[in-house]
A protein has these predicted regions:
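Ligand-binding pockets and gating/stacking loops
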Residues: 1-429
Length: 429
């Protein structure tokens, strides 16, 4: 009675698409949204701010490291020498050099940066992507919230919200030559006519049971399946998950390359599919890239990743801008924390949440500015420190979501989306 994978996996995609009904029931106090979609680039492990967006050339050698600063399109603003392409689009970005929190553990830092809350043993809070799915729901046949290539952290999930608000993870890396997304194609032996026939049979059986028992859960379940069918039946939605139609020029713009001998996948393929997903209607796409936890041999680790990230990120910004999408697409680049200002005895940098850098672009964010500052050693905030509550509240504001609104947590206890967060006007266009 079920279509291939849908029967084998229970609700599967239908469960994911439960968010449509939840969004319909939501009584959100909607603000005017500047951003229609978000592309969130998560640099997993702890990204070194002083070797990327906040170099300190006048610091002692054990602090400044080995990368020279290079000029950007913003007068007097410098990035590290591995950020050559991003330096050319600095006039389209806001670089925050004063991000700060207190969590030195990876998982605790992730929870803080993804939810706007410090971790609590009593409650796991929902990620921004899951709140967006809950509050705004899907567009057309696309899932609201997608993770590329996988859910890079448990705290990118739905927290205390329903699992239906969790991300749809691709389950495969678009940089691989054999890339395909599970669950998006009809199984072998089931053509379009057979697919529609099975759908009709299920609707007939559901109608029979609905006449015998009026149950809200049954009615809700029915809508989940309908959404799953809609995605399977939409060629446009399925096409968004493929890179086959992209030109060689676009691939070159993103710096796409085959899977190489070094175990570092191409950022370009991941960022390009993120653009395709928001273009097709996805509201929130999180792309996880890299392994930045460089406690030893720091510069060896970043030299295999940072140029790839640089090319792909600059390509994404250019592509969105040229397509007229940047003003309505909020792009975020963040990590769970930064890295220690001083290089350790093993040639590495350790965890450092006290100050680090993030990037925001498009979607109502001011173009061409540096917000905040770190001190001379990139060790502490020196100006306009930005905490997680205000950062996440500002992201919600740009999406038209009131972060002061309460959602219902377990035990029917109202819980603000963010507690005591303020919109940072200095970040807004």
């Amino acid at each position: 009675m079920y279509v291939g994978w849908l029967g084998g996996a229970g609700l599967s995609l239908g469960n994911l698409l439960q968010l449509e009904s939840q969004a319909a029931e939501s009584q959100a106090r909607r603000l005017e949204a500047k951003a229609k979609s978000v592309i969130h680039i998560y640099l997993q492990g702890g990204f070194a701010h002083m070797d990327s967006f906040d170099p300190k050339p006048d610091a002692p050698s054990e602090y400044r490291g080995i990368l020279d600063p290079i000029a950007t399109t913003l007068p007097g603003v410098y990035f590290s020498s591995h950020m050559k392409q991003t330096a050319k689009v600095a006039d389209k970005l806001t670089v925050v050099r004063s991000m700060t929190h207190t969590e030195v553990d990876h998982s605790r830092g992730e929870h803080s940066m993804f939810t706007g809350y410090r971790p609590s043993p009593a409650l796991v809070y929902p990620s921004v992507g899951s709140v967006v799915a809950h509050e705004l729901g899907p567009r057309d046949a696309m899932p609201s919230y997608v993770c590329v290539p996988n859910q890079g952290s448990q705290f990118l999930g739905s927290g205390y919200l329903s699992n239906a608000c969790g991300p749809f993870a691709l389950g495969s890396d678009p940089a691989r030559s054999n890339f395909s997304v599970r669950d998006l194609n009809l199984p072998k032996g089931i053509d379009e006519k057979r697919f529609e026939r099975r759908k009709d049979w299920k609707q007939m059986v559901d109608g029979h049971f609905a006449s015998l028992e009026r149950d809200d859960a049954l009615a809700t379940m029915d809508s989940f399946y309908q959404r799953a069918y809609d995605l399977l039946a939409s060629p446009q939605a399925r096409e968004a998950f493929s890179l086959k139609s992209e030109s060689d020029a676009t691939r070159e713009l993103y710096g796409m390359k085959p899977w190489g001998p070094v175990l570092r996948p191409s950022a370009g393929a991941r960022f390009l599919i993120a653009r395709r997903l928001v273009e097709a209607g996805a509201r929130f796409v999180t792309v996880t890239y890299g392994a930045w936890d460089t406690h030893a041999f720091h510069y060896r680790g970043i030299e295999t990743q940072l140029p790839d990230l640089d090319r792909a990120f600059a390509g994404l910004i250019r592509d969105l801008d040229e397509r007229g999408m940047l003003d309505s697409t909020l792009v975020l680049v963040s990590s769970e924390f930064g890295r220690t200002p001083k290089v350790n005895a093993g040639g590495g940098r350790d965890h450092w949440p006290r100050v680090f850098s993030i990037v925001m672009a498009g979607g109502g964010v001011k173009r061409g500015q540096i917000y905040g500052a770190s001190d001379a050693l990139a060790a502490e905030p020196a100006d306009n420190p930005l905490g997680v509550e205000d950062y996440i509240t500002t992201v919600y504001h740009l999406l038209g979501i009131d972060a002061a609104k309460s959602l219902m947590s377990p035990g029917d206890r109202p819980q603000p989306i963010v507690t005591n967060g303020k919109v940072v006007q200095g970040l807004l266009a």
